[in-house]
Amino acid sequence: FGSLLGICLVTQIITGLLLATHYTADTNLAFASVAHTCRNVQFGWLIRNLHANGASFFFICIYLHIGRGIYYGSYLNKETWNTGVILLLTLMATAFVGYVLPWGQMSFWGATVITNLFSAIPYIGQTLVEWAWGGFSVDNPTLTRFFALHFLLPFVIAGITLVHLTFLHETGSNNPLGIPSDCDKIPFHPYYSMKDILGFALLFIALVAMALFSPNLLGDPENFTPANPLSTPPHIKPEWYFLFAYAILRSIPNKLGGVLALAASVLVLFLIPLLHTSKQRSMTFRPLSQILFWTLVANLLVLTWVGS
């Protein structure tokens, strides 16, 4: 899945760059500029659909990648693992600021709700939120800085990815048995390159099918309405890939407690290498750990379902 994530990143940067050429980061024009891209730009609708659904595929790939890393004990390559968690956090930040850009209802209210969480931080919270907003509510300054961040962060991700790969190159990759595989090494090309191309093809077919046949399947219908600060949508919720965290946030009645739980649900990945006590690296021959692992997966799926 690592190679698929690389392809996702490249695709997102290319489609994003093409979209940015037609986008206007202004509260009065943002929604109209996206509509203009879809209607009047050659293949603008396709580029937008690929970009929007590409984000979903990016998250599908990264969650599978992390799940596999946990299952096979890959987190024992501590530097690789920690840079990977930082990559996940950066990706989540990028997806969040990107979701705000079309300036639909859910964009606006999602931005309002999530940035407002920073006000739960004691003492500096309120100042921090107003500083992030550039005013006393989510408005034009917020949109322009979010566009700047959304343009910048993917290149930051690309940079950290190189660090991630460098650390991986130090140790070599892991395998399902969790034992050294020096004696089984084979040339990257043509073997691994062909294996990766199969993955690319499957990912690409799935993405194109999604973008062409049901591009709005994962989107929120509220986002077809331009942002209106005076009318709150009946249910504010993020895109599906944040629902597990959002469900955790909303299940805790205390604001600060919810924010801490939300942060912990992702940051717990940093602790995993410290919690490994088994003499075996991978879960291949550890039924109890397997049960716990699949319970965790089921838990995430249930949280995602409940969050919506």
Curated annotation (Swiss-Prot):
Gene Ontology terms: biological process: mitochondrial electron transport, ubiquinol to cytochrome c
Subcellular localization: Mitochondrion inner membrane
Record note on cofactor: Binds 2 heme b groups non-covalently.
Keyword set includes Membrane: yes
Amino-acid positions noted as binding heme b b562 in the UniProt annotation, renumbered to this chain: 51, 150
Annotated GO MF terms: metal ion binding; ubiquinol-cytochrome-c reductase activity
InterPro entries with a match to the protein in the record: Cyt_b/b6_C, Cyt_b/b6_C_sf, Cyt_b/b6_N, Cytb/b6-like_sf, Cytochrome_b_C_euk/bac, Cytochrome_b_N_euk/bac, Di-haem_cyt_TM
Amino-acid positions noted as binding heme b b566 in the UniProt annotation, renumbered to this chain: 65, 164
Domain of life: Eukaryota
Chain segments annotated as transmembrane: 1-21, 45-66, 81-101, 146-166, 194-214, 256-276, 288-308
Keywords: Electron transport, Heme, Iron, Membrane, Metal-binding, Mitochondrion, Mitochondrion inner membrane, Respiratory chain, Transmembrane, Transmembrane helix, Transport, Ubiquinone
Chain positions recorded as a ubiquinone binding sites: 169
Signal peptide: none
Cofactor: heme b
Entry membrane topology: Multi-pass membrane protein
Record-level GO cellular component terms: mitochondrial inner membrane
Function: Component of the ubiquinol-cytochrome c reductase complex (complex III or cytochrome b-c1 complex) that is part of the mitochondrial respiratory chain. The b-c1 complex mediates electron transfer from ubiquinol to cytochrome c. Contributes to the generation of a proton gradient across the mitochondrial membrane that is then used for ATP synthesis.
Extra facts: Heme 1 (or BL or b562) is low-potential and absorbs at about 562 nm, and heme 2 (or BH or b566) is high-potential and absorbs at about 566 nm.
Family: Belongs to the cytochrome b family.
Quaternary structure and partners: The cytochrome bc1 complex contains 11 subunits: 3 respiratory subunits (MT-CYB, CYC1 and UQCRFS1), 2 core proteins (UQCRC1 and UQCRC2) and 6 low-molecular weight proteins (UQCRH/QCR6, UQCRB/QCR7, UQCRQ/QCR8, UQCR10/QCR9, UQCR11/QCR10 and a cleavage product of UQCRFS1). This cytochrome bc1 complex then forms a dimer.
Record's protein name: Cytochrome b
